[in-house]
UniProtKB/Swiss-Prot annotation:
Assigned GO CC terms: chloroplast; DNA-directed RNA polymerase complex; mitochondrion
Chief place where the protein resides: plastid
Complexes and interactors: In plastids the minimal PEP RNA polymerase catalytic core is composed of four subunits: alpha, beta, beta', and beta''. When a (nuclear-encoded) sigma factor is associated with the core the holoenzyme is formed, which can initiate transcription.
Protein biosynthesis in keyword set: no
The protein's name: DNA-directed RNA polymerase subunit beta
NCBIfam families hit by this protein: PRK00405.1 (NF001616)
Organism: Capsella bursa-pastoris
UniProt superkingdom: Eukaryota
Function: DNA-dependent RNA polymerase catalyzes the transcription of DNA into RNA using the four ribonucleoside triphosphates as substrates.
PROSITE patterns xref list: RNA_POL_BETA
InterPro entries for the chain: DNA-dir_RNA_pol_bsu_ext_1_sf, DNA-dir_RNA_pol_su2, DNA-dir_RNAP_su2_dom, DNA-dir_RNAP_su2_hyb_sf, RNA_pol_bsu_bac, RNA_pol_bsu_CS, RNA_pol_Rpb2_2, RNA_pol_Rpb2_2_sf
Amino acid sequence: MLGDEKEGTSTIPGLNQIQFEGFYRFIDQGLIEELSKFPKIEDIDHEIEFQLFVETYQLVEPLIKERDAVYESLTYSSELYVSAGLIWKTSRNMQEQRIFIGNIPLMNSLGTSIVNGIYRIVINQILQSPGIYYQSELDHNGISVYTGTIISDWGGRLELEIDKKARIWARVSRKQKISILVLSSAMGLNLREILENVCYPEIFLSFLTDKEKKKIGSKENAILEFYQQFSCVGGDPIFSESLCKELQKKFFHQRCELGRIGRRNINWRLNLNIPQNNIFLLPRDILAAADHLIGMKFGMGTLDDMNHLKNKRIRSVADLLQDQLGLALARLENVVKGTISGAIRHKLIPTPQNLVTSTPLTTTYESFFGLHPLSQVLDRTNPLTQIVHGRKLSYLGPGGLTGRTANFRIRDIHPSHYGRICPIDTSEGINVGLIGSLSIHARIGDWGSLESPFYELFEKSKKARIRMLFLSPSQDEYYMIAAGNSLALNRGIQEEQAVPARYRQEFLTIAWEEVHLRSIFPFQYFSIGASLIPFIEHNDANRALMSSNMQRQAVPLSRSEKCIVGTGLERQVALDSGVPAIAEHEGKILYTDTEKIVFSGNGDTLSIPLIMYQRSNKNTCMHQKPQVRRGKCIKKGQILADGAATVGGELALGKNILVAYMPWEGYNFEDAVLISECLVYGDIYTSFHIRKYEIQTHVTTQGPERITKEIPHLEGRLLRNLDKNGIVMLGSWVETGDILVGKLTPQVAKESSYAPEDRLLRAILGIQVSTSKETCLKLPIGGRGRVIDVRWVQKKGGSSYNPEIIRVYISQKREIKVGDKVAGRHGNKGIISKILPRQDMPYLQDGRPVDMVFNPLGVPSRMNVGQIFECSLGLAGSLLDRHYRIAPFDERYEQEASRKLVFSELYEASKQTANPWVFEPEYPGKSRIFDGRTGDPFEQPVIIGKPYILKLIHQVDDKIHGRSSGHYALVTQQPLRGRSKQGGQRVGEMEVWALEGFGVAHILQEMLTYKSDHIRARQEVLGTTIIGGTIPKPEDAPESFRLLVRELRSLALELNHFLVSEKNFQINRKEV
C-alpha cells in the first residue's frame, strides 16, 4: 500500500504511463537480471572460460530517427554492448573486449515500437497468479471433494486432493496420482521429518501401509516410484543419475518453479516464512499445503475465488521483453559453446568478439514483435484508438485462455474489478469479457497486481487531512470504501449520515463516521472510451459498450469540430495520444508553414517537422495544421499544431448536427438514417483516405525484371501517367485500370510459338530467344484518386532475396453516401438510406431544415436515453454559444439533476434568442416542425437537437462488391467467398426456400447450376454468350451433388438411381 506524497488533489495520470513504466522497468531491471543469469562457459578440457561482465552493459542511442525508420521500413532500435572476458586457466591470462550482442527495439513517445517501419504495440496479459488455490467440487454422490492446486510460474499445475478416507494424493497428470508421502520422500524428506513437519501426523500415519513404507524406505525407492507413476513406465526401472536429471527437467523445473510472485503468494496463503529468493517449491510447502487441505476437509479455512483480481497477475511489456531476452541469451549460449569447441578443434585462437554473434538477440526480438499474439499492429484510425490500444488487457495469448475454452464466470464482471478494469469496455463477439480495458487511474504494482487509488479519511476530522493511497485487490477488502454521495467533487459539501459503501465485495449502507476510504474521481472505474460518453448513467451498459467501441472506429474528418456536450476528458486524451504538436519549452515563433514550425528558446533555434498526408494502417489520413502565428511568444506545453481529429488540443471525432427523432416515409426503418444533401455538398462528413499500392522487382532465372514505360500490346491511354522510368508521376489523377508502375518479366517462349527465323537462329547459333510478360501494377477497382507520394526503396545488393520495392500512395476524397455507417456516442448506430434535397427535409419554426432524421423507436427498447439529454443540451449550447463538460452520475448532487440542467439551459436559450419554440412547457424538449414537401406541420411535436454524430470507418466504398467471373473452390467447384478473393454471394437454404415460395423455377435453376457448380453447363454458357444462340439446359447433377455421393461412398454407401419401364417393368440401373 503506497501513499502519494501530495495530499488532497489528484490529477489524471498520463494515459500512456503503463507502457512507459513497463519498458523502463525492463531497461532498468530486466536487462541486468537476465544478463546476470548468463553462465560461465567452459570448453571440454576446462582450459578456456568465457563470461559476461554485466555491470558495464551499454545501450547506444539509435542511429536513425523515428520518422526515417517509418519512411525507410527499418527498425527503430538501440545496439546493446557488454564487456566479455576470455580466461585461459593454464596461463591465467584474460582478454577483455566490448562486444555487440544485438539490437533491442526501443519504445517511442507514443508507447509503441517501430519494427520494419510498422508501429507495433505490446498489450498487457492477465494470467492466473502462481501460488496455491483451494477449491471444492461435488462428486457424483453429492459429497464435497476438496483440492489444492499449485500453479507454477510457467503455468504448470500440481494438484493435491483428499479422498473420503482422508488420504492425500498428488495428481501429476490427468490419469496418474501418487501418495503425498512418496512425493515428499522423492523431494528429500524421510518419514520422521515428514511427521515432525505436519500438524496432523496421525492422519498421515493412518494411510501408511507396509507397501507404502517400502516405497518410501529410501530416497532412491521414492524417486523410482515417482518416476514410474509420472512417466507411466512399465517394468522395473533402475535408479541412475540420468533418471534424476530427467525428473528435474520434466517435473521439478516445469511445475515447481514458483518465481518471486509465487513464493510471496504461497508464504502468505500458508503462513510460511521461507525467504523470497527461494523460488522453487520445497517439501515444506507441500506438507503445509496438505495440512491446509485437511483443515478444509474439517471445515477450517476459506476457499479461493479464482476470478478475484488478487489471484491474477499482469504480465506487462517488461515481463514479455525479459522472457524474450532470456530466450535469446540461451540461444547465444549454445552458439558460444559451439564456436569455442570449433575453434579448439581447428586449433584457432578465439577472442570474445569472434565467439559472440548478434543474430540470436536481433532475430528473437524481430520474430517476437512480428509473430507473438500479444504484439499487435498499432490501430491508428484516430487519436482515441491509438491511446486505448496500449491500455488493453487480454486473457488470451500464450499461457492464457482461448475464446472457445473460457467459461462465463471468467468473462463476467467481478467486484474486485472496481477502479481497476472497466466494467463497460470490452470487445464484442467470441472474445467478450476476455479483452478488457484498464480504468483511468489504475496502475500496475511491483508484484504484477492492479492498483487503484483512494482517499484515506482520518478519524478526528473526516475532511481536514486527506491522503491518497494505492491499494492492490487483496488490500481493499479490509476497508470500508465510500461511494455515491461521498464522491462529491466539492469536499465542502456536508456529507449525509448514511452513505453507500463497499466492504468485502458486498455493498452496504453505513454511517459516514465508519468510512475508511473514499473514491477519488467519478470516472475512476471507467476506461477512456467509456469516460468520453456524456450522460453514460442514463444508458444501458450494452449500448455504452457499443459506443466505446464505435468511437474507436470514427474516421477523422476534413474539418473537425469540438463537441458541444462532452465529459472534460477530451483534452487529456488528445494530448496523450501524441497527435498534436506541443512546445517542449517556451520561446518565440520565427517561421511557420505547412511543413515545419521554427521557434527560438533557451538560446537555441528548434525546427519541428509537421506530419503531412501520412497514411495510417487503416488508410485514414494523418495531417498536422499549424495553430500559431509568426512572431508570437509561446509557453511550454502550448499546442503548436493540431492533428487529425483534434481541434485546439481537444479530441474532435465528429460533428454537431441538427437532428430530428421522427419516422419519415419508412426511410429510417430499423436503424436506417435519412440525411440532407447539405452534409454532402457542404463537405460536413468528407474524409480523406490514403491507399498504398506496392510492387516488387525480382531477379528471375531468366534474368532481372525491368521497370519501363515501353510496354507492348497496351493502349497508350493506360500509360499516360508514367514518367520516362515507367513510374506514375506525382500529382497525377488515376482511374481504375490505369498502370501505376510498368514492369516486364522475362520468360522463355515455348518451342511452338517461335517464328521460323527465330528457329533458324536457334538451330545455327544456339541463341536462346527470350520474350517478356507484362506484370504491371494496375489500379484496382474503387482505387481512383490523386497520387501524393511515390517511394522507390532500393536495398543493398539487388538479389532475389532483397527485391526492390516501389510504393505508390493515392489519396481519395470521400463524401458521405448511401450505405455509409454513422453513429452517436450512445450506441445509436445506423446506415444512410437516402439523401434528400434540403427543401424536402423537415424544417424548424425558424425555417432551418434538419440535417439528419433518426428513428425514435430506436430509443425505448434499447434504453440509451443519454442520447436524448445530449441532443437537447446540444441545441441549447449551439443557441447560447456554450460548451458543456459533464461528469457522470450527477444524480449524486440531487435527484433528476440531468433533466433539470437540460431544461434550465433550454429555457435560458429560449429567453435569450426570443424563440419560444425552443422550450415549450407543454412538451419540453420537443417542438412543432414542418414537412418540407408540403409545408404542413407534422401531427406530433418532435424532439430536435444537436447531438455529436460520428462517421465510422465501415464505408460502402470498401464493402460494395460484384462478381461476373472469378475463381472456384477446387473441391466443391463453387465460387470462393469474400471480396478480397473476387468471391460470389452465397445462396443458402433459406434463400432457396424464399425463391421456391415465389415459384421462380428458372432463376433458381440458374442459381444452383450455371452460376454455381455445374462445370459443363457454365462452360456452355460462356460459349453461347460469345457466339450467340440459346443457353442449353443442364442435364446431369451439379458438382456438389457428386461430392455428396463420393462422401457417401467413403462410408461404403452406394447411391444410384434406376429407370423402371412402364411396359415390362424392366429396371435400367444408371450410375450417378
